[in-house]
Amino acid sequence: MRGSSFPGFPSTVASHTLRIATRKSPLALWQAEYVASRLRAAHPDLRVELVGMTTRGDKLLDAPLAKVGGKGLFVKELEQGLLEGRADIAVHSMKDVPVEFPEGLHLAAILEREDPRDALVSHRYRSFAELPADARIGTSSLRRQCQIKCRLPGCSLYDLRGNVNTRLAKLDAGEFDAIVLASAGLKRLGFQERIAETLTPEQCLPAIGQGAIGVECRSTDTRTNALLVPLHHPPTAWCVLAERAMNRRLDGGCQVPIAGFAQLEGDTLSLRGLVGNPDGSGIIRAEAVGHPSTFEALGKRVAEHLLDQGADEILRRVYATP
C-alpha cells in the first residue's frame, strides 16, 4: 500500500522526509531502523531519517535506575523533540513508556511483539536451576530482583546498567555468574546464542510492555498518524494496553517491582500481574480474563485484586526508600 492511498494528506509523499526521534544505543537504533524499514515497505516513496537524541536515563549510568526515580527517563527528551517539531515520530521500547502522555502527543502504533520473556545469560550455568545458592547475578530491574530473590534467597544481586553490549561485556569480564536481560533485545541484536535459558512467566513475570515497540507522534498530525496505520498490530496492542491499564491503576512506573503480562488466545485475553518486595520477602499475584475489547477494564480489575492484597503498601515502601 503506497502512502498516497491514505485519505487526509496529499499524494506528494516524496516531498516530505519523516524524521524519527530515537535514543542512540544499539538496540534503540535497531528499533528505529526497523520502524523505518516498515514505513518504507508500506510507503515506497516515503523518505525517512533518524534523529538521534540523548535522554536523562542515558546520562545517569552510575546510579541504579530505582534510585534515580521519576517516570519517562528514556522518553522525555524524545517527546520534547516531537513537541518542538524536531521530529515527527518517536520510537520507544514500550516497557519504558509512562502511562500518561504529554498534552499534544499520543501512542499512534504498537508493533507486533517480539518474545516478551526474560533471558538468563551465563557462561557456566545453562539454567536458573543450576545456579549456586550464592550466585552473583546482575540486573538493574527491581521487578527481576524481587522474583529472583524469591526463588534464590541466598544470591547476591548487583546493579547492571548500560546497553546490551555493555552488560554482556561485564558478564564476560567475570563480574557475575549470570545476568538477566530481556530476550527481545538479545534477539534483535543477534545475541540469541548467548541465551542460556529463556525464563517462563512462572519463573519471572515480564515487564509491562516488554518486547513491544511503540511509536509516538503528535495527536493533530493527521498525515503521520495515517502513515503509521499499517504498522499497528491490534493483538499486541490489546495485550500491552491491558498491562498498561493495570500499571496506571497502580500508579506504577517502569522502575518499580511491578510485572504484568497479557496473552491473547482466540477471543480470550488473559492478564497476570505481580507486585513484590525487592528483597523477595513477599510477592503478590493476581490474574483475570476477559474479551480483548475490555482490555482497559481487565487491567483495572487485576490491579484492584493486587491492591486488595496490599500492593499499595509494598509500593509505598519502595517509593519511600531513599
From Swiss-Prot:
Substrates-to-products reaction catalysed: 4 porphobilinogen + H2O = hydroxymethylbilane + 4 NH4(+)
Pathway: Porphyrin-containing compound metabolism; protoporphyrin-IX biosynthesis; coproporphyrinogen-III from 5-aminolevulinate: step 2/4
In-chain residues carrying the UniProt-annotated modification S-(dipyrrolylmethanemethyl)cysteine: C254
Top-rank taxon, per record: Bacteria
Swiss-Prot/TrEMBL GO biological process terms: protoporphyrinogen IX biosynthetic process
Its EC number(s): 2.5.1.61
UniProt-listed Pfam families: Porphobil_deam, Porphobil_deamC
InterPro entries linked to this entry: HemC, Porphobilin_deaminase_cofac_BS, Porphobilin_deaminase_N, Porphobilinogen_deaminase_C, Porphobilinogen_deaminase_C_sf
Gene Ontology molecular-function annotations: hydroxymethylbilane synthase activity
An annotated GO cellular component: cytoplasm
Keyword list, A-Z: Porphyrin biosynthesis, Transferase
Cofactor note: Binds 1 dipyrromethane group covalently.
Known role: Tetrapolymerization of the monopyrrole PBG into the hydroxymethylbilane pre-uroporphyrinogen in several discrete steps.
Further remark: The porphobilinogen subunits are added to the dipyrromethane group.
Family indicated by similarity: Belongs to the HMBS family.
Descriptive protein name: Porphobilinogen deaminase
Organism encoding this protein: Methylococcus capsulatus (strain ATCC 33009 / NCIMB 11132 / Bath)
Lineage: Bacteria, Pseudomonadati, Pseudomonadota, Gammaproteobacteria, Methylococcales
